[in-house]
Amino acid sequence: MEKRAAAGLEGAPGARAQLAVVCLVNIFLTGRLSSAVPALAACSGKLEQHTERRGVIYSPAWPLNYPPGTNCSWYIQGDRGDMITISFRNFDVEESHQCSLDWLLLGPAAPPRQEAFRLCGSAIPPAFISARDHVWIFFHSDASSSGQAQGFRLSYIRGKLGQASCQADEFRCDNGKCLPGPWQCNTVDECGDGSDEGNCSAPASEPPGSLCPGGTFPCSGARSTRCLPVERRCDGLQDCGDGSDEAGCPDLACGRRLGSFYGSFASPDLFGAARGPSDLHCTWLVDTQDSRRVLLQLELRLGYDDYVQVYEGLGERGDRLLQTLSYRSNHRPVSLEAAQGRLTVAYHARARSAGHGFNATYQVKGYCLPWEQPCGSSSDSDGGSLGDQGCFSEPQRCDGWWHCASGRDEQGCPACPPDQYPCEGGSGLCYTPADRCNNQKSCPDGADEKNCFSCQPGTFHCGTNLCIFETWRCDGQEDCQDGSDEHGCLAAVPRKVITAALIGSLVCGLLLVIALGCAFKLYSLRTQEYRAFETQMTRLEAEFVRREAPPSYGQLIAQGLIPPVEDFPVYSASQASVLQNLRTAMRRQMRRHASRRGPSRRRLGRLWNRLFHRPRAPRGQIPLLTAARPSQTVLGDGFLQPAPGAAPDPPAPLMDTGSTRAAGDRPPSAPGRAPEVGPSGPPLPSGLRDPECRPVDKDRKVCREPLVDGPAPADAPREPCSAQDPHPQVSTASSTLGPHSPEPLGVCRNPPPPCSPMLEASDDEALLVC
């Protein structure tokens, strides 16, 4: 109900603002904030909003007396341009000075009454006609209220003026307003122009008994309305002409033994005035002389300190206490059932209590009182249920309230088709069995959802005979008036907490994904920030930064880029072979590296070398000792070859480990000593022995350096060693050579042949052997 009302407030235009005004008005009228909060949650903490065209509103616990300390509120919302008309059927609110204790408030009112419409007392108020398309209603009972007033019951209808026609069960006023048919000729002007009370030949449709104020009762057989005080009811004297004030009176003795299978009894102060100065204690023993169950129904009017105890079995304490009832159960009927056919009822009342005791009826289950009809029957052909052991009286027939679990008391009513049931209040509306007890109102007053003995599938049956949705069961919020929907629930986490946890985990997971995405994005941007601004010059600069390390000092001398210096080591044959192997491996590695680079990389490399590097020998052309000349010998496969057609140059000086002097700088031979002559050819210079030579091929041979006896003469000949002249020129052995140093080799060569390529290389590398 509260959930449905909240949903209705969202759909109504301006409903929230109007609800705020309602709250402020209630605070102003009651003077307490604590009274305003329950008012917004009408009667048991529920807000009741009405948007139906026709409906019925009544006070809490109707038709019983309303409880003290109650705040209720209702809100009727119409369409734009609608006029809302309210007519009171019953009205009994405890009267006080200026209606300061208990009151009913309606607003906004029509001109000339602009202020709120505040009511109390027992007289039927005039019809209320709204000035706008909405009406708010407040009901308040003070905590000090006696609780002896019945309350009110009103009907309303909304619509526009100037209607051309009305529904079949409605009456059209002269001003075009449509009213329910029973409102015609009821002595109350609901049309506003008096047209509903004109030409009335029949008496008012309301029975005269309904016009008696609270605290009185009518004489049912009187031709005119006569209301008597309740103290004269069942006092042993006939005050009504037909004796109706003494008809059907219960036994008012203070306790006795009852032996019939049905009967009734009441406390002595039920119809009496205020209790005397002494306490009252009465006990009733009920013995139906039957082993079947016995049903007990009580209507309580207890005072603040009064109470009733019901026991199963006979005796002052009985066998088992069934229930203890206090004033809190005053305004609702109480039904108890004993497993045996015997009951004990004990009543305790305080002196000068404001209560009026109780009225009780009992019967064996399955039997009905003489003036009642059974809900069940011997067969279910007439609409009854074989298992329904309830009863109903003739006034309860077709009153819109189910007194039988099978609904037999509401079947076959003349106002509805055979397969439908009437709504409460005589509105003429009907509903089907499928609309019964499904937590969805089909009647304006919700009669189809009251006194439910069973519920439709998908709903839960409350202890107060109401039905709610099954999903509202154990959701942490009491939706039944007795809170039975939250009883027996497991100690589980409420659904709201689970929903909040799921939403929170989803949000946290989403934030984690976003954080990881940002981290990966930043990492990607940092790794790509240089590539994002890459140009031709940046690529060339990167290539320049990644160039190979410059050659060492020894490699520069070996390549002939710088002249030899003193004390630089001399390459022996074994060292030259190792160096040649290293160079060959380097060339292969460079060729392999060049094969991986694309043409564009090679072109960029050549362009960079031309722009920023001074000319130098290609990588593959590495001279052994000195810069390349036409007659220079380049180390190819371990031997020196002269270039063809070139003039024979003096042989390149062989370097020893201790000195870098050339052979031509040898000191002259000793004077007077003839030069030594080799086996064939001119005589050897002074200080040299005949070298030991061995042929390598047809044109070349290798000679071991002859032993040097002394420094060579300065004028020693510098003739190259050849096949015809096998005497090589050698350098002087260094004095720094140790005894284990390898002996230098002299290489004899023919005139150098022309240079020709020996090995395949890349585009920017040239390997020539001369």
UniProtKB/Swiss-Prot annotation:
UniProt protein name: Low-density lipoprotein receptor-related protein 3
Superkingdom as given in the UniProt entry: Eukaryota
Function (record text): Probable receptor, which may be involved in the internalization of lipophilic molecules and/or signal transduction. Its precise role is however unclear, since it does not bind to very low density lipoprotein (VLDL) or to LRPAP1 in vitro.
InterPro entries: CUB_dom (IPR000859), LDL_receptor-like_sf (IPR036055), LDLR (IPR050685), LDLR_class-A_CS (IPR023415), LDrepeatLR_classA_rpt (IPR002172), Sperma_CUB_dom_sf (IPR035914)
Gene Ontology, cellular component aspect: clathrin-coated pit; membrane; plasma membrane
Assigned keywords, A-Z: Coated pit, Disulfide bond, Endocytosis, Glycoprotein, Membrane, Receptor, Repeat, Signal, Transmembrane, Transmembrane helix
Family affiliation: Belongs to the LDLR family.
Domain CUB: from-to ranges: 43-159, 254-365
Cysteines engaged in disulfide bonds, as pairs: 43-72, 99-120, 166-178, 173-191, 185-200, 212-227, 219-240, 234-249, 254-282, 416-430, 423-443, 437-452, 455-467, 462-480, 474-489
Acidic residues bias spans: 761-770
Organism of this sequence: Homo sapiens
Record text on subunit structure and interactions: Binds GGA1 and GGA2.
Extracellular side: 37-496
Subcellular locations according to the entry: Membrane; Membrane, Coated pit
Membrane topology: Single-pass type I membrane protein
Polar residues compositional bias, start-end: 729-738
Location of the region described as Disordered in the Swiss-Prot/TrEMBL record: 635-770
Annotated signal peptide: 1-36
Residue span, LDL-receptor class A domain: 165-201, 211-250, 415-453, 454-490
